[in-house]
Amino acid sequence: MSESLSTSNDPLSQPSEPPTDIKALDFFRDDRLVADPAPYYEALRGQCPVLREPHQNVVMVTGYEEAVSVLNDAETFSSCTSVTGPFPGFPVPLEGRDDVSELIERHRDELPLNDQLPTFDPPVHTAHRGLLMRLITPKRLKENEAAIWNLADRVLDGYLVGGEGEFIGEFAGPFTLLVIADLLGVPEEDREEFLAHMHQRPQEGGGIGTTDGQSAAHSPMEYLYEQFAGYIEARRREPREDVLTGLATATFPDGTLPEVIDVVRVAANVFSAGQETTVRLLSSSLKVIAERPDIQHLLRTERDRIPNFVEEMLRTESPIKGDFRLSKVPVTVGGVDIPSGTTLMLLNGAANRDPRRFPDPDTLDPTRSNARQHIAFGRGIHSCPGAPLARAETRVGIERLLDRTTDIRVSDRVHGPADARDYRYIPTFILRGLTHLQLEFDVTEPNTESDTEGGHTA
């Protein structure tokens, strides 16, 4: 049985007063901003949509148009520090130079996570992104979506037993991990090992962007590197008619065969990043469904509303709080002059609540007509290639949970009464998501039409 998460003095749970003092609060270190950063975002944007915060010297971009303009400008802005931002800092001073492009390339290998696709710039990024898009083709995504329904039911079979369960650890985590494993062709006999190894990661910190100031670690990437290197090398020696052989023989856009490590990096990044963010999206979606009977009723009776509900969840609860960019040359963003060598944080979660783009932005509206204009998946050359998969996983997960239950509720025993909930959030300035979500549900009778036919059209 899960213990109560009551944490009245815990900064990782909801604060009693919204923290908005920009001068007093360090976004990258203050746990008071973890549970609900929206008031802080609004305070930033209220001063200026492009504003330098005083603690880490980062220019915070909270405006929608301003963020999109930066995301679309890979010529002016480098992604070399896109994951870690100002930490641990650039190896050499960048101030006072007209163009820091040469310094970036000279010291790129000294930066954290420099072997990961999100930190690449053109032309290296162009080649590796091209390789990635040869792995995640529309045909492969369609094949994978057909398997998503079965995988959802497979995990739900165990999760729904007993009438309650911890959603993130018992459903969202295993489900999304198995979906990614299927997409990348991990052999069926190896998937339980992947599940055991990858799903034992700590839920409450220790990863990239933690507010405790710990440096970024590569685990569990090292495990993924080892596994996929073995797969790729084996398929190059002995090709088969399977997805892994497609991975092993995929070429760069110019037709050259990548080194094994290049393929491994792309596959491992898709596996790790895609699984983590979709878990957060699924859990935030189910929290709303369980907390809001009106929305649950709407989605149960009008299933065609689910895709737009997912978009609205991406807008209001962006799983990635933001991405970083480093200005290579002096530039103006939203009327604000930015010197070369400046770290900017593009706050997706703030831009997605910009009232200039989204009227009444703090209201979650499943019928919002422009919900899909959010930038939760980024824009430009680094936009998330797995966005169609994340959308499909979340839609299918919601549909099958609704098919197989008649009511879903948040556990009062674990999270407290409805008027005084306690939720804990991951203490990072990168990810936005719950650490636990205990749900209770009334399960439908087996062998209903939706169960036997899958409740969907593929």
Q: Over which residues does each language-model region extend?
A:
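Cytochrome P450
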Residues: 1-458
